[in-house]
């Protein structure tokens, strides 16, 4: 009878340990999934921002250097700046601050880009700041 009791106790201990390990595994898997999903969202938003920044920079250069108001349309620039600013919310607070600075500079300088090298340089400088911030966040992902 004593041997049966020992087997029952051993069985109960094994069941409890299996349950604990099962719950811990589930918790870890859930945490890992959420973390990976968050990193993926940041990565996708970052790549989209980098593409939009390159497109905005091309827009600025077409407007200033090529005097091409079709490729350098300020309306297209406004759309790109707005999209960059919206996507920066998904990346990092530092990138949101940089994109806000880009939007502020664009608001101030967009009408002078066609004629002023200083305005062009100011906008391009802010574009570079947002790029640097975005690259920094991408490097930190694991």
What is each of the regions a protein language model found here?
Residues 1-16:
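N-terminal positive-inside, membrane-proximal cytosolic segments immediately preceding the first
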Residues 12-29:
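Hydrophobic membrane-insertion alpha-helices, especially the h-region
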Residues 27-142:
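Conserved non-transmembrane functional hotspots
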């Amino acid at each position: 009878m004593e041997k049966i009791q020992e087997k029952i106790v051993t069985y109960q201990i094994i069941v409890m340990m299996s349950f604990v390990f099962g719950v811990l595994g589930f918790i870890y898997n859930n945490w890992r999934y959420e973390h990976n999903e968050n990193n993926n969202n940041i990565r996708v938003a970052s790549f989209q921002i980098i593409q939009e920044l390159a497109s905005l920079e091309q827009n600025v250069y077409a407007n200033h250097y090529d005097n091409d108001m079709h490729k350098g349309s300020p309306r297209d620039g406004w759309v790109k700046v707005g999209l960059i600013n919206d996507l920066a919310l998904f990346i990092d607070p530092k990138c949101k601050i940089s994109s806000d600075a880009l939007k502020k500079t664009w608001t101030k300088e967009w009408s002078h880009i066609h004629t002023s090298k200083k305005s062009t340089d100011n906008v391009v400088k802010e574009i570079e700041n947002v790029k640097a911030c975005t690259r920094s966040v991408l490097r930190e992902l694991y």
